Amino acid sequence: MKNIDLTEVLAAARGEVPADIVLKGGCIFNSFTGEWEIGDVAIVGETIAGIGSYSGKKEIDVTGKYVTPGLMDSHLHIESTMVAPRELAKILLLNGITTIFADPHEIANVLGTAGIELMLTETEAIPLDVFFMLPSCVPATEMETSGTVLTAAKLEPLVSHPRVLGLGEMMNYPGTINAAAAVLDKLALAGCSLCDGHAPGVSGKALNAYLAAGISSDHEATTADEAMEKLRRGAYLMLREASGAHNLLALLPAVTPLNCRRCCLATDDRHLDELVSEGSINYLIEIGTAHGYPVEQLLQMATLNTAERFRLYDRGALAPGYKADICVFNNLVNFQPQLVLKNGVVIVNKQKLLWQSPPLLKDPENTMHLEDVREQQLRLPVMNGRKARVIRIVPEQILTETEYVQPKAEAGFVVSDTERDILKLAVWERHGSNGNTGVGLVRGFGLQRGALASTVAHDSHNLIVVGVDDQDMLTAAVALQEAGGGLAVVADGEVKAMLPLPLAGLMSDQNTEFVQHKLQQLNFWTAELGVPENVNAFNCLSFLTLPVIPSLRLSDKGLVDVGKFAIVDLWE
């Protein structure tokens, strides 16, 4: 804050001059104590001057309404929304989100440091504060092929950027626990004193070793017991509610008045249709309160706790000297803000956004570098008398299970089996590195005919296709190759629906309405082809390639047993 600004703030705080804006008569949430108090919020420029009784050049009556700090998302991947950052900003601001902490490892897996720099550029000078944690695992493991390999040396020039706060989720937890040199190099990056964690199911001495490396948070807990152990060992707990990982209600029983201040809320990977229809962090608060959890604790998690976890001491509370990032709600049941201020400026009024996002600063480059896609690549010779490892989908989770099944075969080759819901799954390397193709089997999609394809395939984002028919699988793969990446549904040899994602094969260059319309078409066709209502087909598909979440995955290099952290044969 400049001295001249501080002089004005202090004069208004003393009540000697009118504030620029005063929110009058609201029920104000105190993030420090969890209390509510009736009063005014006085704002000068970007700063809160005081709480109490004030007059202002502009006064906004919020009597009977609930006033809170702007909400924060402690961990998300912008790319997972499938819209560009500036388009996402519009959605988040409408939901009262004023600060986010993003890990751009999706685009970094495709474009390397150029992708991180693009995200930094695209989030400059917008009314949403976007901070970044540098991707720590590109690729996530050596058991897949990404578009680049990010070493500590490549990341170091980005450390000094003012919106880079540390190192993103350390997914290579075996490498961390066992002190792998490349992992330790990244943990030692100058300036990266904060490091987010990713340790699904890690406990006991392995958890001790993981956290002793300097990692200080985790968002992968799925049970209250796991959450409590991580809290006891000093990690910040980020309670996640994502499109494919619904963990919030399972974790909230671990939150108590004594440990609440070490807890934050996170959306991780949340799809656009759910952001638009349900919301973001505000929706997580709504879920929690609807199930009887104290709104005060949930608000602390979404504001002050998150700010303090990332050592940002200028936000997260309605108090003198803090940023004037503010939400006003009609009630504590429906958390859709009626008024949102960002840096002291009204940005949302009566659920209408008062900001127009500028266009993309850079035209997308083609990132689809596949070699020829051929039917022969999909062939799996049957191994008589041997069972195959099959990836089993767990509904509403990104975890998978491993099954051992005698697959259906025709003419000596494995084929999809709709009666037992066992489908063929393929991953094509798309970065132009080696032309690999991995082929496996998956159970739980419910698909009765056709094929689904996606270049959103965590974390290396190769091309993944699941299908009943090899020819439809090939048609879907070729369609996305020609489109520059995206999502596609194919049946009877025809593309039934497609969403092009020309930004690294991950994000659209179109507006929310366009993307939403295309997603609705895709969802319609997945249902038509048999996918049950409780399976988010494309979100589920996108995580079947992630070799750091138990238990069985498929990469371009083959089947990955995450427990063994090794490539395994299809046949037992």
Please place each PLM-identified region on the residue numbering.
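Active-site mouth loops of central-metabolism enzymes
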Residues: 73-84, 139-150, 216
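Divalent-metal coordination cores built from histidine and acidic residues
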Residues: 3-12, 89-194, 495-499
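Histidine/acidic residue-rich metal-binding segments in metalloenzymes
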Residues: 115, 149-168, 172-239, 245-265, ...
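Active-site neighborhood of phospho(di)ester-bond hydrolases with catalytic His/Asp-centered motifs
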Residues: 68-74, 102-105, 133, 168-170, ...
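Active-site microenvironment of metallo-dependent hydrolases
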Residues: 1-44, 52, 93-95, 276-292, ...
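Divalent metal-coordination and catalytic microenvironments
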Residues: 26, 46, 64, 75, ...
